[in-house]
Amino acid sequence: MSGNNSSLSYKDAGVDIDAGNALVDRIKGAVKRTRRPEVMGGIGGFGALCELPTKYKQPVLVSGTDGVGTKLRLALDMNKHDTIGVDLVAMCVNDLIVQGAEPLFFLDYYATGKLDVDTAADVVSGIADGCVQAGCALIGGETAEMPGMYEGEDYDVAGFCVGVVEKEDVIDGTKVAAGDALIAVGSSGPHSNGYSLIRKILEVSGADKNEELAGRTIGEHLLEPTKIYIKSALKMIEKHDIHAISHITGGGFWENIPRVLLEGTKAVIDGNSWEWPIIFKWLQEKGNVETHEMYRTFNCGVGLVVALPKDQADAAVALLKEEGENAWVIGEIAQAEANEEQVEIQ
């Protein structure tokens, strides 16, 4: 036995159970405001229960998981944590809507070296805000305090979401055809992708995050939360024959649009159909980033690209605008030759 007779505790090892309990008490109100009628029970159980909505005849569950990448580093540097949870929810639920799914419930994982209750409560409050926007319930989560794994009060977050769609209404891209119109739905900024390049641009250029750009600081532009498209997109899906939806995330246009296209088709994008939001122009200028690389890394102002019959495009754009979205016709689907790139930006 060791010569040290003092009694050790979990807290001595760097894990504060009392802080964890305090966090649970703090977030109960936030969780409650996300509740859906299908949710059974409250938080704190070993598992969370949720019934399927009764309106579905042949329900298909759609799942997704994601994080927010190195946008977290920016939030930590700026000590602003109340919207990063919105980003987390958005990155998950926007992937579900691509297949026509209505988000049902969401769970989060929060890992840190030393739990700061105020910071964690801000993050969870943001998650609840995102769930309210998406119409899904925050039904559970995990907070892991792991001394030695993370530096100080640094943290990481991950999210997991489950949605539901009628089997016959699954959007899988199989209806995409040459002649379809492509609609863009505007983004709120870089969303949660490309932040390693953004941080490199800030470092190399020596730019000040407090510098003003179009009435806001650079930092405010960069921490603008990811737009959640669920409610407007569900209305569009209800009214129109949607052939495919692409969520423009990591990999930009070149990587994400081909994921929903059939072999032998390509997306022809009119690069003059919209003006990049000013933050993307600033990033390109400060980082001397080539235009192709911008489209490969960032959404450049486009959060979703939607394929649908050409004769429905104008009505769909009008509906999206009524729902508060910035939407426009951005291009069309065309036939592609063998081995031809599936995205062409003119």
Swiss-Prot record:
**Keyword Cell inner membrane annotated:** no
* Functional pathway: Purine metabolism; IMP biosynthesis via de novo pathway; 5-amino-1-(5-phospho-D-ribosyl)imidazole from N(2)-formyl-N(1)-(5-phospho-D-ribosyl)glycinamide: step 2/2
Q: Which GO terms describe its cellular component?
A: cytosol
The EC designation for this entry is 6.3.3.1
Signal peptide start and end residues: none
Gene3D superfamilies named among the record's database cross-references: PurM-like C-terminal domain, PurM-like, N-terminal domain
Question: Which EC class is the enzyme in?
Answer: ligase
Q: Which SUPFAM superfamilies match?
A: PurM C-terminal domain-like (SSF56042), PurM N-terminal domain-like (SSF55326)
Report the main location listed first in the record: cytoplasm
Cell compartment(s), UniProt? Cytoplasm
Keyword list, A-Z: ATP-binding, Cytoplasm, Ligase, Nucleotide-binding, Purine biosynthesis
Pfam families given for it?
AIRS, AIRS_C
Catalyzed chemical reaction(s)? 2-formamido-N(1)-(5-O-phospho-beta-D-ribosyl)acetamidine + ATP = 5-amino-1-(5-phospho-beta-D-ribosyl)imidazole + ADP + phosphate + H(+)
Question: Which family does the record claim for this protein?
Answer: Belongs to the AIR synthase family.
Q: Which GO terms describe its molecular function?
A: ATP binding; phosphoribosylamine-glycine ligase activity; phosphoribosylformylglycinamidine cyclo-ligase activity
Superkingdom, taxonomy of origin: Bacteria
Report the record's Gene Ontology biological process terms. Answer: 'de novo' IMP biosynthetic process; adenine biosynthetic process
- What protein is this chain from? Phosphoribosylformylglycinamidine cyclo-ligase
